Amino acid sequence: MRFGLNIDHIVTLREVRKTYEPEILEALFIAKNTHKVDLITIHLREDKRHIQNEDVLRLLEISPLPINIECSINAHITDFLCSLKNKPSKVTIVPENRNEVTTEGGLDCSLKGLGETIKAYQNKGIEVSLFIDPLEDALHFAREHQVKQVEFHTGVYANLHNALYSNANNQIHAISALKEKSPKELKEELHNAFLQLRKMSKEAFFMGIMVCAGHGLNYSNVKELLKIPSLRELNIGHSVISKAVLVGLEKAILEMAQLIKR
């Protein structure tokens, strides 16, 4: 299993104070020196709430690890990434809403301009991945546009798992809709969410599409996904950076790697 470490929230902490620390390159090399991280993931958002263009340039210039850049189909971002001398190893196209706290679901594949954006990156020799819900129509869209990788949105699975097996439902930011469900309902919906991820991962595999997954994954809910044989890559960020605040980045990475690289 490939481990993609999302380091957006290293930069979130920097941007809160508009200062120079923590240094994103230091985080990069801590990750590299664990020998457990396979790629670095960053999200270049339209509102630049964390990662900035300058961060992209610095990372691509010196990173010993492949860089996966998540972004919307915004034309300015597409033009910027396509113009780079040092190219990312892949671009993952994600939906984006300026009012969201984090990405809320997979891409709407009927989105105007999506096909053109995919082609723009492909014409520059940049691998494209689509961040999609585990749905058959989305997979067929990927295949029709010669997309060789997809990343399944695991938010539904992760939220259900957290509601059932952690104290998430008792926290200040608990999801209201999940608080109203019984443990039996949560368990059934979680089982169905897992089965859907497994089914669509298998279908993607037979289409010749590499399957990645991410969103909301943490030290508790990630283990079940290892039972999906066609799943090749997990992109995880917030939970690792959250633990790093308490135990240090190296230890947080190693603990996650121990779970997913068995």
Swiss-Prot record:
Primary role: Catalyzes the complicated ring closure reaction between the two acyclic compounds 1-deoxy-D-xylulose-5-phosphate (DXP) and 3-amino-2-oxopropyl phosphate (1-amino-acetone-3-phosphate or AAP) to form pyridoxine 5'-phosphate (PNP) and inorganic phosphate.
Which E.C. number(s) belong to this protein? 2.6.99.2
Biological source species:
Helicobacter acinonychis (strain Sheeba)
The record's Pfam families line, in alphabetical order, gives: PdxJ
Q: Where is this site: Transition state stabilizer?
A: 151
Q: By its UniProt entry, which PANTHER family does this protein fall under? A: PYRIDOXINE 5'-PHOSPHATE SYNTHASE
Query: What UniProt keywords apply to this chain's record, in alphabetical order?
Result: Cytoplasm, Pyridoxine biosynthesis, Transferase
The protein depicted here goes by the name Pyridoxine 5'-phosphate synthase
